[in-house]
């Protein structure tokens, strides 16, 4: 089956790269706050002062921190309290989640995702990735952030996927081709590659760039440090679990394949056992994922 003609593909590729460069990055004060949360000399007051510039962001942070998932003994009303009860690393993850919400809350019809579904899926993958990292004695908060950011490329590629949707879906249905491979064949790019480019543009750590770029095909992630390879595996498995559970599945969940090699590298025997472990807190995400209301 033929895709778009070569000239159209080249035009799309140029426009995708242009869109990646034009999309706004995280606000500078958020970047500064994340650095403060990495600095052992910082105080909770320093962080709170910086975040106070955006009242809406603070509200989203507190909604996440007060979710049943974290099980705090009382309802918190300030970022300072959140840091005291959850610690700098966890609050850093929450700040980043609340910051990218604005990019993910819309409808992404190219991927058959209604409003809020991309956010719900990303947050679910973040929680499952954190759980897996804990099981394999990895970096839990790094896994959470990598899971949150893994599908960011969809916000750029959505309009282009919508343009080529008919051809992409026919490749998936008629030739049993994974959706991401069909994206690549038709458009010359896929959302994982674009996500990696976006995170590189935002100057975020390579771990997050690789996790986004290879979350569908971890076997292609080669010649990288073991810590990065393991994070790619963690996010791949977390994404697969969430798709199997029907969380924000969208069109690209069609023909999705779980890498047994990734499971083996993580020393995990059964995806069914993993699903049974995460089902309770994933149901909490289903109830609490909206931050914009």
Task: Put a short name on every predicted segment.
Residues 1-255, 293:
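Conserved alpha-helical "signature site"
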């Amino acid at each position: 089956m033929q895709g778009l003609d070569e000239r159209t593909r080249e035009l799309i590729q140029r426009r995708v790269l242009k869109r990646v460069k034009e999309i706004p990055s995280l606000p500078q004060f958020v970047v500064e706050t994340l650095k403060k949360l990495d600095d052992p000399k910082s105080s909770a007051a320093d962080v709170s002062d910086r975040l106070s510039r955006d009242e809406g962001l603070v509200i989203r942070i507190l909604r996440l921190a007060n979710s049943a998932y974290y099980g705090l003994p009382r309802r918190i009303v300030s970022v300072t309290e959140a840091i005291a009860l959850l610690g700098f690393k966890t609050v850093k993850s929450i700040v980043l989640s609340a910051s990218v919400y604005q990019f993910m809350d819309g409808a992404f019809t190219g991927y058959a995702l209604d409003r809020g579904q991309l956010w719900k899926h990303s947050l679910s993958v973040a929680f499952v990735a954190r759980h897996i990292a804990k099981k394999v004695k990895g970096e839990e908060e790094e896994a959470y952030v990598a899971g949150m950011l893994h599908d960011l490329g969809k916000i750029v590629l959505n309009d282009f996927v919508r343009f080529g949707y008919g051809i992409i879906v026919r490749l998936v249905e008629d030739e049993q081709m994974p959706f991401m491979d069909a994206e690549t064949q038709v458009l010359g790019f896929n959302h994982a590659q674009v996500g990696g480019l976006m995170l590189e543009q935002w100057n975020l750590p390579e771990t997050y760039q690789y996790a986004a770029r290879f979350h569908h095909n971890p076997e292609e992630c080669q010649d990288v440090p073991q810590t990065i390879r393991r994070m790619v595996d963690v996010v791949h498995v977390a994404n697969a679990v969430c798709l199997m559970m029907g969380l924000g599945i969208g069109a690209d969940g069609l023909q999705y394949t779980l890498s047994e090699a990734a499971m083996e590298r993580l020393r995990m025997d059964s995806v069914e056992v993993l699903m049974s472990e995460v089902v309770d807190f994933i149901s909490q995400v289903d109830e609490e994922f909206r931050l914009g209301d």
